[in-house]
């Protein structure tokens, strides 16, 4: 037992899955032999992992280990980098998302992403939430109103903003803006929600609210989170993947990884010997 490891939220340890042998019904994403290069530099090397449905999976590791790079692969954000080249597969519903036939815009509707810093649009709170729906051609006001309330409730923000929906989103606090961005993401009903260090720019109170929200979100979505904060990973995730220098070193249920890791590199990292 590693006594200085982060304390794991025991509420997330009730269901322990065999991550190497998930059934089709249990699997949200399959990552197979994934390599990523920026020019001649290899940033990810032979990453293999299965991400379960309806749970929270955390990617941890020191700066530059490849965790955010891997996260961005899941909705092809790395396509925006000209010198990026990817080999291997990421399967969603059994289809490789990097197949030429894949509609990338449709993929990103199905795999939403929230970044480190809140990025509300220069619009009202209401228009931020319905932005994706309007892009899909939805105009029915009753439908839009329903989605706004459902999404803001889902992001634990409704009670705070229901009387000022037509005010600028820039009038919200940082924590509220991040929850608004989450509401905007879930308004179009993605299957998977990617969170790239979603609390790194927030104060401790706002961070706690977001962490509680993450635990609620997994009842409807598969959540994958990148975090530098090991304590946060221990609090919110069901599974944790430890990455180092572009390689997946260890991947298991969060309780096992933080209390009885199998790899020396993992133990050294979570006990603070490097990082």
Curated annotation (Swiss-Prot):
Which is an annotated GO molecular function term of this record? ATPase-coupled phosphate ion transmembrane transporter activity
Q: What is its EC number?
A: 7.3.2.1
**GO cellular component term, pick one:** plasma membrane
Subcellular localization: Cell inner membrane
Keyword Translocase attributed: yes
Enzyme class name: translocase
Q: Reaction catalysed?
A: phosphate(out) + ATP + H2O = ADP + 2 phosphate(in) + H(+)
Q: Which PROSITE patterns match?
A: ABC_TRANSPORTER_1, ABC_TRANSPORTER_2, PSTB
Q: How does it sit in the membrane?
A: Peripheral membrane protein
What CDD domains does the record tag this protein with? ABC_PstB_phosphate_transporter
InterPro entries named in the record: AAA+_ATPase, ABC_transporter-like_ATP-bd, ABC_transporter-like_CS, P-loop_NTPase, PstB-like
Q: Which UniProt keywords apply?
A: ATP-binding, Cell inner membrane, Cell membrane, Membrane, Nucleotide-binding, Phosphate transport, Translocase, Transport
Q: Which residues make up the binding site for ATP? A: 61-68
Tell me the ranges covered by the ABC transporter domain, including all copies.
29-270
- Keyword Nucleotide-binding assigned to the entry: answer is yes
Q: What is its main location?
A: membrane
Tell me, in a sentence or two, what this protein's role is: Part of the ABC transporter complex PstSACB involved in phosphate import. Responsible for energy coupling to the transport system.
Assembly, in brief, is:
The complex is composed of two ATP-binding proteins (PstB), two transmembrane proteins (PstC and PstA) and a solute-binding protein (PstS).
Q: Which family does it belong to?
A: Belongs to the ABC transporter superfamily. Phosphate importer (TC 3.A.1.7) family.
Cited NCBIfam families: 3a0107s01c2
PANTHER family named in the record: ABC TRANSPORTER I FAMILY MEMBER 17, IRON EXPORT ATP-BINDING PROTEIN FETA-RELATED
Q: What is this protein called?
A: Phosphate import ATP-binding protein PstB
């Amino acid at each position: 037992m590693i006594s200085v490891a982060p304390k794991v939220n025991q509420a997330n340890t009730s269901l322990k899955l065999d991550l190497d042998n998930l059934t089709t019904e249990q699997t949200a994403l399959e990552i197979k032999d994934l390599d990523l290069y920026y020019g001649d530099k290899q940033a990810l090397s032979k990453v293999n992992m299965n991400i379960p449905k309806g749970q929270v999976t955390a990617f941890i590791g020191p700066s530059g280990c490849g965790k955010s790079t891997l996260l961005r692969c899941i909705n092809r954000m790395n396509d925006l980098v000209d010198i990026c080249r990817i080999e291997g597969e990421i399967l969603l519903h059994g289809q490789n998302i990097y197949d030429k036939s894949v509609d990338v815009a449709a993929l990103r509707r199905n795999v939403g992403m929230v970044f480190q810093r809140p990025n509300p649009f220069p619009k009202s709170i209401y228009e931020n939430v319905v932005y994706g729906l309007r892009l899909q051609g939805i105009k029915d006001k009753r439908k839009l109103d329903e989605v706004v309330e459902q999404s803001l409730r889902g992001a634990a923000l409704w009670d705070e903003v229901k009387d000022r929906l037509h005010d600028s989103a820039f009038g919200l606090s940082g924590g509220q803006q991040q929850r608004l961005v989450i509401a905007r993401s879930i308004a179009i009903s993605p299957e998977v929600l990617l969170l790239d260090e979603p609390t790194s720019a927030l104060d401790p109170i706002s961070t706690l609210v977001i962490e509680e929200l993450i635990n609620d979100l997994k009842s409807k979505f598969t959540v994958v989170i990148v975090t530098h904060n090991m304590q946060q990973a221990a609090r919110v995730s069901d599974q944790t993947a430890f990455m180092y220098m572009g390689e997946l070193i260890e991947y298991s249920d969060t309780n096992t990884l933080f209390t009885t890791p199998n790899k020396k590199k993992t133990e050294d990292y979570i006990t603070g010997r490097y990082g």
